[in-house]
Amino acid sequence: MALSVEEKAQIVTDFQQAAGDTGSPEVQVALLTANINKLQGHFKANGKDHHSRRGLIRMVNQRRKLLDYLKGKDTTRYSALIGRLGLRR
């Protein structure tokens, strides 16, 4: 259920701040969002998979922490990221 190497590379190139940037909050949030979206499809077919649901909740919490960090550091980057990813906040 993980993202393929090509999908990860595409997300990194779309959200990186500079060449070779894989650790910025934008990249990390985008990768987590892609994983979360993929897992949501998994749960439509496998509703009782509670072990994977724990991993999903952990990813959602990690994404929330990164978004809170980015919001505190730079609200314009936060707003741009939320808009690009289509998140609710």
Curated annotation (Swiss-Prot):
Q: Which key words tag this protein in UniProt?
A: Ribonucleoprotein, Ribosomal protein, RNA-binding, rRNA-binding
InterPro entries tied to this protein: Ribosomal_uS15 (IPR000589), Ribosomal_uS15_bac-type (IPR005290), uS15_NS1_RNA-bd_sf (IPR009068)
- Gene Ontology CC terms: cytosolic small ribosomal subunit
Q: Name one Pfam family in it.
A: Ribosomal_S15
**What processes does the entry annotate via GO biological process terms?**
translation
UniProt KW rRNA-binding keyword: yes
Q: Which residues form the signal peptide?
A: none
Give the quaternary structure. Part of the 30S ribosomal subunit. Forms a bridge to the 50S subunit in the 70S ribosome, contacting the 23S rRNA.
Q: What family is it from?
A: Belongs to the universal ribosomal protein uS15 family.
What is the role of the protein in this entry?
One of the primary rRNA binding proteins, it binds directly to 16S rRNA where it helps nucleate assembly of the platform of the 30S subunit by binding and bridging several RNA helices of the 16S rRNA. Forms an intersubunit bridge (bridge B4) with the 23S rRNA of the 50S subunit in the ribosome.
Q: What is this protein called?
A: Small ribosomal subunit protein uS15
